[in-house]
């Protein structure tokens, strides 16, 4: 039978990771099926989108509180759909406050994975216990994260970041300027407001 993967990705960065994850799994399991919360890159990679990844793109206390009832309803709805669809594994990509709570509810009914570790090694290390209770495996972007989880007896694997193979360590500045049609000697200021719609709107108000 084909491998079935339930998946929830939040915002643009999760969509990028999710698309690479789908491609990597399909390289080993060509018939694998993916469904859940997905962005445009994941959809293009073959994921069936029940909801858009933009539904989880909230940040900051005020914005989270404003959307909390909607997020709770979404989590209950996803739990019911995943239980009905019965995937072999649930993979939460980033969005730890949402995905770990969902994973805790699904664990036992299916295997659960958290792809992208919360920065638990930097602050509130006590959260590692709830992470272990929520997922069967953590997929880590950074090598020292796996060592941290090893010390706390939480199963983890270092997988790296897919963009590390696509972005060179040494950037050819002249080539980059040519690609962006920028004058060679001009001063360039990059404006990087973020990937969340609420973040862009808030920072662009003035």
For the regions a protein language model found, what residue spans apply to each?
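Active-site and donor-binding regions of nucleotide-sugar-utilizing enzymes
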Residues: 3-177, 192-204
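Phosphate-coordination loops involved in phosphoryl transfer and adenosine-cofactor binding
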Residues: 2, 183-186
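Short active-site neighborhood of thiol/selenol oxidoreductases, capturing the structured segment around
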Residues: 189
